[in-house]
């Protein structure tokens, strides 16, 4: 697991106590996106890590994975593929259900987005429990692709997502981490 910690990235992320409920320390990356220098440092760190690594597709998970995955896709000249919540993609999809802290959710991917042999990089803003990214990995695998790496702006290691994804054989890049929930 690789960690890059430019201060500008970490310092641009706002922490909001007790949101969305008591006891949660919410890590708000919208303040990073509003800071051009921090956003550039974030994308540049991803570019440096993944340039010339042989990826054939970049997948961003809804919705902030789009914000970080699309510029990386552009910079590397690799197709960007969105993974969406149900009912948002217009063509035939493959679905994957996954568990949330209080219930279930589903992610979808166009059936023609990944072809057997694709080497896929997954991108999202934050890794907490790992449920969303695990569901995304399973979608890629259902279509015959190989998800080998996952990139996150923020990781919350105490919530177990890093261990969960590492057990699946995925290499993780986190730019910053925060303690607690």
UniProtKB/Swiss-Prot annotation:
The catalytic activity of this protein is classed by the Enzyme Commission as 2.4.2.7
Predominant subcellular localization, coarse grouping: cytoplasm
Q: Which domain of life is it from?
A: Bacteria
What Gene Ontology terms describe what this protein does at the molecular function level?
adenine phosphoribosyltransferase activity
Give, as in the UniProt entry, the pathway in which the protein acts.
Answer: Purine metabolism; AMP biosynthesis via salvage pathway; AMP from adenine: step 1/1
Its BP terms in the Gene Ontology are: adenine salvage; AMP salvage; purine ribonucleoside salvage
Gene Ontology CC terms, in alphabetical order: cytosol
Chemical reaction(s) catalysed = AMP + diphosphate = 5-phospho-alpha-D-ribose 1-diphosphate + adenine
Give the location in the cell: Cytoplasm
Q: Which UniProt keywords apply?
A: Cytoplasm, Glycosyltransferase, Purine salvage, Transferase
Pfam families to which the protein is assigned, alphabetical: Pribosyltran (PF00156)
Provide the function of this protein: Catalyzes a salvage reaction resulting in the formation of AMP, that is energically less costly than de novo synthesis.
**Stated family:** Belongs to the purine/pyrimidine phosphoribosyltransferase family.
Per UniProt, subunit arrangement is:
Homodimer.
Family annotation (HAMAP family) = Aden_phosphoribosyltr
Q: What protein does this entry describe?
A: Adenine phosphoribosyltransferase
Organism listed in the record: Pseudoalteromonas translucida (strain TAC 125)
């Amino acid at each position: 697991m690789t960690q890059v910690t430019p201060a500008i990235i970490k310092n641009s992320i706002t922490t909001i106590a007790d949101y969305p409920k008591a006891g949660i320390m919410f890590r708000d990356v919208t303040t990073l996106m509003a800071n051009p220098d921090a956003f550039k440092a974030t994308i540049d760190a991803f570019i440096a890590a993944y340039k010339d690594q042989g990826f054939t597709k970049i997948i961003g998970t809804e919705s902030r994975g789009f914000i970080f995955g699309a510029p990386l896709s552009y910079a590397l000249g690799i197709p960007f593929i969105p993974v969406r919540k149900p009912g948002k993609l217009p063509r035939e999809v493959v679905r994957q259900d996954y568990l949330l802290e209080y219930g279930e959710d589903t992610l979808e991917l166009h059936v023609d987005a990944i072809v057997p042999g694709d080497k896929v990089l997954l991108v999202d803003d934050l890794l907490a429990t790992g449920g969303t990214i695990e569901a995304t990995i399973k979608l890629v695998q259902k279509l015959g692709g190989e998800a080998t790496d996952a990139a996150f702006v923020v990781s919350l290691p105490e919530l177990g997502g890093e261990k969960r994804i590492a057990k699946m054989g995925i290499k993780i890049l986190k730019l910053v981490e925060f303690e607690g929930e």
